[in-house]
Every structure is written in C-alpha cells, then in structure tokens.
Amino acid sequence: AMNDSTIYGVCGEGTSMHNLELISDGGDTLSVFIDDENPDVVQGGLLAGDRIALIGYKAEDGEMMAQKIINLTSLLGKWTSLDKNFDILEGGEVKNNVKAETNPWTSWKILNGKLLLNKDTFAIDKLGSDSLMLENTQGIFVFKRQE
C-alpha cells in the first residue's frame, strides 16, 4: 500500500489567510504557511473546528509550507451530477442514492492530497460551498451540493 503523507487534524483558532494552525490528530499544534499566490492550495475554506487534511513540506528555513489543504468537513454532504447522486459521510463511507448505479462508490479516503472513491483516484480541482470539481485521466467531473 502507498504511504499516505497526509497530516490530519482540526483547524485551530489561530488560523489566518497566510497561516494554518492545525491541531493534528497526534496532538501537535502545527503552524503552516499558506502561499496565497496559488489559490488552489486551500480547498473547502478554513474554519476553526473543521476537520482538515494537510499535505505539507518543510522549506529550506525549516518552515512548514502547505502544498494542499483539503477541508474534510466541507467535503462531507450530498453531491449530485447528471448521473451521480451520493453522500460523502464521516468515517470514509459513501452512500449511493441512484438505484440503477452499476458500480457505485461506497468508500472514500484522502491519499497524498488526492480523493479516492473506491479505487478511482481524483485530484480535487475545486471544493467550494456548493460545487465540487474532480479530475482524473478520464476527464473533469463537476458535482453540485444538494441541501
């Protein structure tokens, strides 16, 4: 199995536009620099208390830098497209709402900054309040959030 370089935790109160304060699942409080010249770094926004998946690296000066930040709290919920209708649930479960679906997604996880749905690997191009854009070799898939 591939090693997952993702750090999981909760977004801290000290988070700002250029700095993620991450209280990791291991109990450490990390301060991570966010370069806002690349708007794709943060997906799903940053709200204190939200669950976060971080892909980071150490800069030469030792500072922790964010390569990708995925707000897992924002990822949860009901998403629909023309042919898909599914709920991303806490704990890695996907609930499929299309009866005729032949190969439904039943599980999800983050691996090295990518979203795995069953065995399908997607880059998260955009995670907004009402839309989710996933990309893989087969193309770009856009989903809308349903309340």
Predicted regions located by residue number:
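Short, flexible, surface-exposed loop segments at domain boundaries
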Residues: 1-18, 41-90, 130-147
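N-terminal glycine/threonine-rich, aromatic-flanked beta-hairpin/loop signature
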Residues: 2-7, 13, 82-127
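Solvent-exposed coil/turn segments that connect beta secondary-structure elements
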Residues: 25-27, 37, 57-59, 113, ...
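Broad hydrophobic/π-residue packing in well-ordered secondary structure
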Residues: 29, 56, 106-109
